[in-house]
Amino acid sequence: MLDEWFSETFPELSRARNLESVFDSWDMPSEDRRAIEIVKKYAEMYQDCPGIRAGLWLYAGDWETAHLICQSDESATGSWWHAILHRFEGDAFNSKYWYRRAVDHPVRDLITFDPQELVEYSQGKNEGRLYLQKEEFFTLLRWCVENRK
């Protein structure tokens, strides 16, 4: 399972911040000071991997830092993270724009849904959305780690 992969890959971070505390919300994950301090260490380890850094900052709840990273990363990976950030923010128009820029990303073949549809699905509060958010986040982050992106 993807959350087991996360716990094995980022053990200190997964102990600091329970997965459910990030994905049980309909909105942007709240900022977690302890997780932010841990992500600072990982950010140094992955300084050449903006996709990993953006995902970890999002996990820690630091939207601003994750957004700055995405804005400076013009790759499809940066665009995908950018789309996720704007979806969490409730900005459907921007989210769809960034998903269109990531249309050829390899992660599209690894998830079970169309991320553009998730933007529409995100407008309502339902458990299915939470599951898909979690699947998308961990699939993209795992791809970034495996490909050093």
What do these predicted regions represent?
Residues M1-S72, R101, H105-K149:
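N-terminal alpha-helical interaction modules that lie
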Residues H82-H86, W98:
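Alpha-helical protein-protein interaction scaffolds
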Residues A92, K96-R100:
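Conserved, surface-exposed functional patches that form binding/active-site neighborhoods
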Residues R53-A54, H82, N94:
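Structural register within alpha-helical repeat arrays
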Residues F88-G90:
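Short coil/turn linking the two alpha-helices of tandem helical-hairpin repeats
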Residues T77-G78:
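Amphipathic, hydrophobic secondary-structure cores in small proteins
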